[in-house]
Amino acid sequence: MELAKRRGFIWPSAEIYGGVAGLIDYGPLGAQMKRRIEDVWRAFYVIREGFYEIECPTVGIEPIYVASGHVKGFSDKMVQCPHCEEYLRADHVAAANGCEGAAALSAEALSGALRTMPCSACGEELGEVKVFDFNLMFNTWIGPGSQRKGYLRPETAQGIFTDFPRLLRFYRDRLPFGAVQVGKSYRNEISPRQGMIRLREFTQAEAEIFVHPEGKKHPRFDRYAGYEVPLLGCAAQEGKGEPARMSMREAVEKGLVANEYVAYYIALTCDILVSIGVDPSRLRFRQHLTTERAHYAADCWD
């Protein structure tokens, strides 16, 4: 991180006023590199895949996020240290102290696990603490004197989803089709302490591909059918196994990956990362456990 700062890639935002965790400025080289990565991403999704790009506001009205489940469920489990009064992400503290599966634990179970663990800020034993949910969205009011509540978008997907009727007409009422968006998203992270890994404002590049529920065979699947990717499925995680390197065709045939569309875009994502210079030996795709998946997800990989 220090090298990146010295060379003009990134700097702490508002540094002359002390800065704030989770917000960064891209310096001259960082802004240039970021644009080049976005250009490569567009070369895959817009030029090669043929998806059109849209641009939506970063502020959305409350009904959008009520419908998407973000108002009710877009939260992390938080705890406050009784000694230094620092707010901490409870599952991260538990995981750092050897608690397996901390992300899937209930608030009550986390409270019990944290009892003998040290605070990651001051080092004191946490003791009896209450774990509670903290919603990660930034909220605001739209218009002067208005009672219309809004939020800074936590991801770019919602704009694409709310534009679906218009997009469907644009694509002449035919599935499948895709739409992409590159833009800022915002998450009020509890303790953004991992450099650029967990920011409060960040750029997302997102593609949403709409397919018929009964038509999940990708028309160009052969392009990536033989593409091999290390996959860490649910069963391997539960058995403490290692990622298994296999082709996308094999992953679909074995039922590890839900369908050809999911497999195609796992491979395409890997292809993009390798294209921008990421070492392929450092990549693996991990399947979300059933307890981690969003309510709408049949399959999900990171």
What are these regions (language model features)?
Residues 1-302:
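TRNA-recognition modules of translation machinery and tRNA-sensing kinases, especially anticodon-binding
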